[in-house]
Amino acid sequence: MIGGTRSPKVSVVVPTHDSGPHIEKLVASLLRQSLPAAEFEAVFVDDGSTDGTPARLAELAAAHPHFRVLRIENSGWPSRPRNLGVAHARGEYVLFADDDDWLGDEALERLHDCARTHDADVVVGRMAGHGRSVPRELFRRNRFDATLANSPLIDSLTCHKMFRRAFLDEHGLRFPEGPLRRLEDHRMVVRSYFLSRRTCVLSDYTCYHHARRGDAGNVTATRLDPAEYYASLREALDIVDAHTEPGPLRDRLHRRWLRNEMLNRVRGRRMLDAPEEWLAQVVREIQGVIRERFAPGVAAGLPPLQRVLAHLAEQGRVADLRRLAEWETGVRAAGTVDRHEVAGTALTVTVSARLESAGRPVTFAADGDRDLLVLPVDDLDPVLRDMTAALGRSRLDVVARRRETSEEVLLPVTSDTRWVPGPAGERHLVHHAVATVDGAALDAGTWSLKARVTCAGWTEDTRLPLVLRPAGDGAAPAVEDERALWTRLRRAVRRRIGRR
């Protein structure tokens, strides 16, 4: 109870710095929360803003008793404001939010209910990305006893979660404030996963909207210093090593940083747009981490494209990385709707999809009983390009995406993957899936369908021509086939031209 004797259920801790109008979505979402205002507080910690942010926060605190504002001299990074927010928080649970993100309207109520129902120390709510990538596989289903060993929990290392405040205090879990500032949330969150008595993943509601500011104005959007960044990454690896023994689990956890923070920086458009001198520094740092910190099983467990990237980076072959990046910019998923039917409120759709490069299928060459990914780089050990182990992890998902909010729902599918021979002895993979969606269970809005191909080291989306428009009242949704719309438009254009 704010201003009374009872502590609030939740404290939302928000670091701010020159937030400007970007904070308004978060503020509006806090004011829309289904959890009563008397049962939560928002603790804004302003990190030395030089614009109108302090005045706006003071205005909000004056109007809303459950909003509190603290001001500090500029520290230059979110760690200190977050830590100060925790020190002043009064809630049973703490949720960290950034000033340019926002919450789902029922986020606090649902996350707190989940935490109390399952006596959880940590609750991870489903996220939607707006110009930012967010975990996907983790949110395929609810998980009420998730661990780093039994789930892809390691895919979610941002701090935008709900933590039991007593748990944070018991273990001294705070964000590092030392000279190594990058990946501060990784180091705090991965420790919390190891120490948590129970961690839940709430996947049936979009709790958090993670956005990239159009002006790239927040501090984490600045170009990283490679030496500082990878020194911070090494500290995250130290935490993993302190809680695991050498072996498959440690390799799998290390693999997350190799894949996301290392290889993703030296592939595709991201690499081609980077300054050459800076990129050379990044590759040198990656090379050092791979050689000094990773067991052979870390890279060996990757799919073939990423194994090749790891090998090229470890060898310092920047020219070959660039050649591969130029080719990879042409890789896309191509999908078709083979059939669809509506029965009652349910839509069943049959989809086929494959990976293409410049309009031609991504191919594999036979090598005895192996199929090797064909890449535009020479002098590669066939083991690096071998698709055998990764074939079972290839799949086709069908995703419903709400246009108004960018939230995504992975639909239940039955799927299979088949080899298709080519004219010159090569072959490629075609993925098939049958998905069913109950339109009556979707929130009101416009939902697009897309196919998501995961294969050989790529995860690529392609839009499908079906759109659902549920009203949110439990009735059957309208289903539009955009192919039919375009056919009608083409016919209308031809008729109009024919009259001239």
Residue locations for each model-derived region?
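Basic, ligand-binding patches in group-transfer machinery
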Residues: I2, S7, R267-R500
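Amphipathic alpha-helical repeat scaffolds of TPR domains
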Residues: R255-R265
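Hydrophobic, Leu/Ile/Phe/Ala-enriched alpha-helical segments that form helix-helix packing faces
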Residues: L30, S34, A61, A236-V240, ...
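Long, charge-rich alpha-helical interaction segments
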Residues: D251-R252
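Short glycine/serine- and small hydrophobic-enriched flexible loop segments
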Residues: F194, D238, N264-G268
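Nucleotide-sugar donor-binding/catalytic module of glycosyltransferases
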Residues: M1-S232
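Catalytic core of nucleotide-sugar-dependent glycosyltransferases
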Residues: Y205-R213, V219-G247, E261-M262, L272-E292
